[in-house]
Amino acid sequence: AALWRAARADALEPAALEAAGFAPGAEAAAVLAGLAASAALRAMSAQGAQRLDRLMPPLLAAARASAAPLACLTRLARLVQAVARRSAYLALLDERPAARQRLAALFAESAFLAERVIAQPLLLDDVLDPRIDRLPLRRADIAEELKHALAALDERDPEDELERINELKASLAFRLGLAFRDGRADAPAAARRLAALAEAVVGAVLALAERELAAQHGRLPGEGSGFAVLGYGSLGGAELGFASDLDLVFVYDGARAAAASDGRRPLDGMHWYQRLAQRVVHWLTVLTRGGRLYEVDTRLRPDGSKGLLVTSLDAFAAYQRERAWTWEHQALVRARGIAGDAALHTAFEATRAEILARPRDAAAVRAEVVAMRARWRAERDRSDAALLDLKQGVGALLDIEFLLQGLLLLHAATSPALLRHTATPALVAACAEVGALDAAQAAALDAAHADLLARALTCTLDARSRVVPRDAALDALCARVTAIARACGFDFAKEGVGSRE
């Protein structure tokens, strides 16, 4: 209580703060003085100011008892300013010591999750919810919760619906972050559920965009939409991070595009699908009060950024057969339908299987996969003798991904069971089942992937770079991945390909 009274009176002594456990004391004094003098606090009602004065002493005590007192204090001060006009939150924190301790622990241990709460104070509802540790987070639960929340909206105003989608996405992603941080979900499970959340969000946004387009231009004749969203990369591989963007490709049924829409301002089919894809990208990336849903990358479509945003599935298939590079077939390994017309998803799966199961020259595949890995590493790897890039480094996540892509391209023609999978753990298991990896190699890759992914997700939650100090265990893990890749004919660490010194 004395510290907060001193802050209110502009009489803080750094030595007193340091003695209380906030070091360096001068930095802590600046944080508290800034909070006490902030415009947000000056604008508080008398009742709100009283609530804050009651809350601050126990809040300071919770910060002092946390794993990182100064960091926790700094973030809590920003949160108090963010919710100063919503004093009900201050009252709830004052009344619930357990929630206060949970908040302080979170703010001390996860810069990323703390920033989410500061940016979207509605997430305090999740922190304050005593059931938070027991709330279901399975894939089906995620989709169902989003569906019910949208169904409860009184009106279908696009902006209001988007705000609700954003709130639910933020809440569910936050809960997933808590589950990973608390050990209730391991890294692969957290990544799968983050991907499931993204799928549900893309599906909701697609429905929103389709209703908006139909209101303006009508619908195309026929069952279903004839439009599909394909997830590539981490989304397609069900390995999404807490701050990942979405790699999306859009396809449509070319036969449906021959007709025009039935509205007052009809569009021909191709332009209708083009508008639909544009609206999906817009709604996913537009900045709202709660931020944007996701960053979106559509450059994996045929002809990349020079190509049309949306193509017919027939044109997509022709491109993959006749003009795609090997690296584009590698990308297809992790591609799958995530939203839109189920019949088109099935047709896409048939196209994907046809392309990936083509017989290939083994030496050419190995050379091209290794060459592309070398190019990516030269452009993107930030490793050196002391630091490892968890994604791009030698023996790190991308080496595992490229190895599995190469193995699938080599073996899918004779082992079509490989084509059922896009996620790394499932691909590792499938490669072992068909003999592309032996049991020991598969176990080592599975363990390495889980370890590296956990480290990468932890870096995100800590708001740290995914370029981390090397240690003996990490170097041994990466060396094992490199040795397995080399044994399979993919020498990703040969001279000129390794990490920079």
Identify the residue ranges that each predicted region occupies.
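A nucleotide- and high-energy phosphate-metabolite-utilizing enzyme signature
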Residues: 1-498
